[in-house]
From Swiss-Prot:
GO terms for cellular component: cytosolic large ribosomal subunit. GO terms for molecular function: rRNA binding; structural constituent of ribosome. This is Large ribosomal subunit protein uL6. Belongs to the universal ribosomal protein uL6 family. It comes from Clostridium beijerinckii (strain ATCC 51743 / NCIMB 8052).
Length: 180
């Protein structure tokens, strides 16, 4: 059995999980609703406030899908119950972020401001001029939106300037030593 896949997923009291025969999983909770189609070779059952994920055979790809499916459903349950968020820090002289309506506008040293529209289900917050919080109920979309913001200025290894995740450690390099 898969170490991850064999564990049942506990369903909180205010969350409902429904599974159709064609493996369409719907998770509803206080923060919203998520729908995802899972692979047909994995069986998903809801019993006694738990979701149980089983596989039909011991093929290598079925073993891999077993843990993946369980993790995806667990992420959906956590998302509709608590939600997900990623925090980004802007490090650099003049690097700033602000909201204009729902749109995120950042000054990152380019000749123009960078404007990013949030994708469906994602919200941006700027508690400080150099901090951006990306939040939503879908873990995949939150990570995608945060990576989309970060790609505009990936942290460089010499001074550490750029957009980094909150607890990310930038591996630093030593500069040139020069002639003596």
């Amino acid at each position: 059995m898969s170490r991850v896949g064999r564990l049942p997923i506990a369903i909180p009291a205010d969350v409902t999980v429904t599974v159709t025969p064609d493996n369409l999983v719907t998770v509803k909770g206080p923060k919203g609703e998520l729908v995802k189609t899972m692979h047909k070779d994995i069986s998903i059952a809801v019993e006694n406030n738990e979701v149980i994920v089983t596989r039909h055979s011991e093929q290598k790809d079925h073993r891999a899908l077993h843990g993946l499916t369980r993790a995806l459903i667990n992420n959906m349950v956590i998302g509709v119950k608590q939600g997900y968020q990623k925090t980004l820090d802007l490090v650099g002289v003049g690097y700033r972020a602000q909201l204009q309506g729902k749109k995120l506008v950042m000054n990152l040293g380019y000749s123009h401001p960078v404007e990013i529209e949030p994708i469906d289900g994602i919200t941006f917050e700027t508690p400080a001029a150099t901090r951006v919080i990306v939040s939503g109920i879908d873990k995949e979309k939150v990570g995608f939106a945060a990576a989309d913001i970060r790609k505009w200025r990936v942290p460089e290894p010499y001074k550490g300037k750029g957009i980094k995740y909150e607890n990310e450690v930038i591996r630093r390099k030593e500069g040139k030593t020069g002639k003596k």
